[in-house]
């Protein structure tokens, strides 16, 4: 790309403008990268907590594993509730949209208390907690992934600015400046040479 730039005063001016813009925008990118690093750290912690809650509720379910083989109890759990909707919004965090759960709405249905033991209530409560924690952990992991992807992209851009665009533009400015300086010296030399020849011809003419 840099080899296609013409070594002219106009090209020199354009490269200077380009460098100024790059150097102006780089601090903004670095700030965004720093903010994203903080958000990613928070998202990792949030996802870890949600996953831990999900795994703990899953272990509580496993403690009743044998009971899940009894159709009567399984039917009681299945019929007791279901996820009606997950109220999820997207918030702008350092320029990227991330999901945030506002509410998880469960529809509740009654089951026969007479046909099921009293501890089925506990089993239903554990099942509800398991389902809710599963949804929360999935959204938290999604949020973490989105922020990590954005951080990766911004980091690539920062490296591009620091390692490629700014150095290349700086070198091109220097190259054009040297070329223009050399050409200026050459032009001055040619002017002096032309004047000298004119003077010589004038002197020769006068002598004749």
UniProtKB/Swiss-Prot annotation:
NCBIfam families: PRK02195.1, V_ATPase_subD
Function: Produces ATP from ADP in the presence of a proton gradient across the membrane.
Single GO molecular function: ATP binding
The UniProt record lists the keyword Ion transport: yes
Gene Ontology terms: biological process: proton motive force-driven plasma membrane ATP synthesis
InterPro entries given in the database record: V_ATPase_D (IPR002699)
Organism: Chlamydia abortus (strain DSM 27085 / S26/3) (Chlamydophila abortus)
Similarity section: Belongs to the V-ATPase D subunit family.
Identification of the protein by name: V-type ATP synthase subunit D
């Amino acid at each position: 790309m840099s080899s296609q730039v013409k070594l002219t005063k106009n090209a020199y001016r354009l490269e200077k403008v380009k460098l100024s813009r790059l150097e102006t925008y780089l601090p903004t990118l670095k700030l965004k990268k720093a903010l994203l690093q903080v958000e990613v750290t928070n998202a990792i912690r949030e996802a870890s907590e949600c996953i831990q809650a999900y795994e703990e509720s899953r272990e509580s379910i496993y403690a009743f594993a044998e009971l899940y083989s009894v159709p009567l109890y399984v039917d009681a759990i299945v019929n007791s509730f279901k996820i009606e909707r997950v109220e999820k919004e997207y918030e702008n965090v350092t320029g990227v949209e991330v999901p945030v759960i506002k509410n998880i709405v469960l529809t509740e249905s009654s089951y026969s208390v007479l046909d099921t033991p009293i501890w089925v209530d506990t089993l239903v409560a554990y099942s509800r907690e398991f389902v809710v924690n599963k949804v929360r952990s999935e959204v938290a992991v999604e949020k973490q992934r989105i922020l990590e992807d954005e951080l990766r992209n911004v980091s690539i851009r920062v490296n591009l600015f620091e390692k490629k665009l700014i150095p290349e533009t700086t070198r091109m400015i220097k190259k054009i400046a040297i070329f223009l300086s050399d050409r200026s010296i050459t032009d001055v030399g040619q002017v002096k040479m032309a004047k000298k020849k004119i003077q010589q011809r004038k002197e020769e003419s006068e002598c004749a």
